[in-house]
UniProtKB/Swiss-Prot annotation:
Residues 201-279 form the KH type-2 domain. GTP binds at residues 10-17, 58-62, 122-125. Transmembrane segments: none annotated. This is GTPase Era. Residues 97-100 are annotated as: G4. PANTHER family: GTPASE ERA, GTPASE ERA, MITOCHONDRIAL.
Amino acid sequence: MKVLKVGVLGPTNAGKSTLINFLHNDDSLMVSSMNNTTLLSISTEVINQANKNIVFIDVPGFTEKKHSNYELITKEIRKALSGIDVLLLVVRSDQNNKIEFLKTQLQQLKRYQNLTRIFLINKFHQKSLSEVNKAIILEEFKPQKTIEINLLKFDKNLFWSIFKQVELRYNIFRKDINFIDANNDDFKILEGLREQIIFYCKNEIPHIARIEIIEKSFNKEKNLLKIHLVISVPKLSQKKIIIGKNAEMIKAIGIATRKKLLNHFDCDIFIDIFVKTEKQKLPVYSFLSK
């Protein structure tokens, strides 16, 4: 089956993951007000539109060099750009203050001339992207089509009606990139845990935490899924934050993660979480299965 791959890219908190979730009518991708919650390029289910099988790739948002995951995110963006056919740039209408930074990022995209380009302005709380800034983006990005839509009041039919007006071309230079599958069970488990780390710990902890599934087993008689997880952080002080006083924080994280996963798995779930310090660099997620 030939698939057209659409990479969704843009500044942090522009609405990239929100858009893809709405297109799929689900919440497979994490949405948060925290910057750079998407650290890896994630592939979603096939959607049949415009007589094509379309897959949307959630790409990490542009980030500055001072960010702790700058190298990882930059690598993921480059990987995604080499493995897509269409580049969908999402910018929130109130992100006028990010225009200079965005301009430098768009200039680096000029080498990917073979990609079809679409520009989506997320009309946010009745605030407008200035005409000057819009012109800068149009000049630097040179999209085939511009879509202006409010993701808080998303009109899927309107989106597709405009999207279909674009001449969607396959990228003959596209590489066969093995993106993470949003429907992979291990991904759902790891992403579910990281979402709760973000909610409870905030600040820098979610960006430096690395998560691993150590063991996973299913008891058919009890209809019970047992999951043993490890959270690794570089410093003892960070470990103490995640565990919390009298282990209250890690208990809350575990309970919330289990509750989240019960929506994805048709069985009871037992979760055991161990927190350790690990100074060497680890992958964001370590899977049992690919």
